[in-house]
Amino acid sequence: MASTVLRRLEGKVALITGAASGIGESAARLFSRHGAKVVIADIQDELALNICKDLGSTFVHCDVTKEFDVETAVNTAVSTYGKLDIMLNNAGISGAPKYKISNTQLSDFKRVVDVNLVGVFLGTKHAARVMIPNRSGSIISTASAATAAAAGTPYPYICSKHGVVGLTRNAAVEMGGHGIRVNCVSPYYVATPMTRDDDWIQGCFSNLKGAVLTAEDVAEAALYLASDESKYVSGHNLLVDGGVSIMNQGCNMFDLMDS
């Protein structure tokens, strides 16, 4: 348990979508350790309920493509804890692993955009609805480092994540007048239990040698954006990619230079 001095979200209420696993679960656990009351919104009921049991958190079943579900999740946070300080729009899917536009199905494109972008739109809309009267709040969405560097990403995924960045910036302009900050965090490849010990994977997906991005690292970035430490940060796309987005892998002259 973080000490009182280090509990950066003490007294705050956070709603996290897609919090039953992955980045969302890591954020739920981290936010809770830092004093936040956490509402977990997900479609994976059993996994989410187990996390709630661990954290003493609240669970609400939520399909982020359905406005009623998202509205209910936000209302649950307010009715249970009296307010909503932090909205983390994290629910997302990658879609089919098809990389050529000619092989991309419209049905998959729509499905990915519905979850990744429409879900963020609905979460932002309803979080703003309850935050505006209080003239404060932090809305954070999970985008992707692929928005900063094209790298053979499936079209549905990359289009949805670019949309998240655009939505974030536009909402930041509007919400700034109400004292509400809107940002997104853009991770690169996140190691999973199956890949984190694979040397090839670590080398391929890391520019910072010896470092591999984990869900916990992304949660730490979200914690910063959720906390008062980032009180003057809004409209920002926080890249958590180890510098990959600024590096041209096909023309890395530093590897050719003498030391």
UniProtKB/Swiss-Prot annotation:
SUPFAM superfamilies for the chain: NAD(P)-binding Rossmann-fold domains
Protein location: Mitochondrion
Active site: 144, 157, 161
UniProt key word Mitochondrion: yes
EC number: 1.1.1.-
Keyword NAD set for record: yes
pH dependence: Optimum pH is 8-8.5.
Presequence range in chain numbering: 1-30
Alphabetically ordered keywords of this record: Mitochondrion, NAD, Oxidoreductase, Transit peptide
Binding positions (substrate): 144, 157
Disulfide bonds: none
Binding-site residues for NAD(+), renumbered to this chain: 21-23, 42, 63-64, 90-92, 157, 161, 192
Temperature dependence: Optimum temperature is 32 degrees Celsius.
Tissues expressed in: Specifically expressed in glandular trichomes of mature flowers.
Family: Belongs to the short-chain dehydrogenases/reductases (SDR) family.
Name used for this protein in its record: Borneol dehydrogenase, mitochondrial
Species the sequence originates in: Lavandula x intermedia
